[in-house]
């Protein structure tokens, strides 16, 4: 048995390879992007499901640190200065503390408000990423892969404990405000 190889000009050979395989690679990329987006969607749904079934009625562990302050508020001894005090000696978290008290006042301290704010911040973050991607000169499959990557990082199952831990709402808010600020700066005409 013998084989006969036909010599071709390198440019013709490369053109034929490119033409023959570009459809296959686009198909593989589209399939990969679709599967990645589906995985991101399923993991997001599972994470949201876990967040809702693991939430329990009653203050979460980090809200117990605020019981003394809540009691002072009910006795009329509390002031807004508390919201500006450093938490744990490290940083001031005015808005999360305010959210804790609003959650306690309106929802009985079950963390429903802080969880909702954290999830809304993540959704808004993803929305800004999607807007940025629409403005870029990328292929649709590349946009899908990038958006799915952000979705996985924003809503992965490792985020569930962060959604439940009310203190972490500060990180979601600061990340969203930071991205929104950079987006606004990038959109300015000057």
Feature annotation, model-predicted:
Residues 1-47:
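Start-transfer (signal-anchor) and selected internal transmembrane alpha helices
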Residues 53-54, 103, 133-134, 155-165:
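Juxtamembrane "helix-exit" motif on the non-cytosolic side of transmembrane helices
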Residues 57, 88, 113-117, 159-173:
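Membrane-embedded glycan-lipid processing machinery
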Residues 116-140, 180-184:
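Transmembrane-helix motifs of polytopic, lipid-linked glycan transferases
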Residues 45-66, 160-162:
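Helix-to-loop transition at the C-terminal end of transmembrane segments
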Residues 173, 178-190:
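Membrane-interface transmembrane helices that cradle and orient dolichyl/undecaprenyl
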Residues 54-59, 72-98, 105, 111-116:
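Membrane-proximal lumenal/periplasmic loop motifs of glycosylation machinery
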Residues 133-156, 176:
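Transmembrane-helix signature of polytopic, membrane-embedded enzymes
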């Amino acid at each position: 048995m013998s084989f006969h190889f036909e010599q071709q000009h390198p440019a013709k050979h490369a053109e034929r390879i490119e033409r023959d395989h570009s459809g296959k690679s686009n198909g593989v990329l589209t399939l990969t992007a679709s599967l990645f987006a589906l995985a991101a969607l399923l993991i997001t749904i599972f994470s949201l499901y876990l967040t809702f079934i693991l939430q329990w009625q009653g203050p979460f562990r980090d809200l117990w640190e605020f019981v003394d302050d809540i009691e002072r508020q009910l006795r009329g001894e509390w002031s807004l200065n508390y919201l500006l005090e450093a938490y744990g000696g490290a940083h001031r978290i005015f808005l999360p503390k305010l959210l804790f008290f609003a959650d306690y006042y309106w929802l009985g301290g079950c963390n429903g408000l802080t969880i909702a704010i954290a999830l809304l911040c993540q959704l808004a973050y993803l929305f800004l990423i999607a807007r940025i991607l629409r403005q870029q000169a990328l292929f649709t499959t590349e946009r899908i892969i990038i958006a799915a990557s952000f979705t996985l990082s924003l809503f992965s199952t490792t985020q569930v404990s962060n959604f439940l831990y009310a203190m972490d709402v500060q990180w979601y808010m600061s990340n969203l405000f930071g991205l929104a600020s950079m987006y606004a700066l990038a959109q300015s005409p000057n």
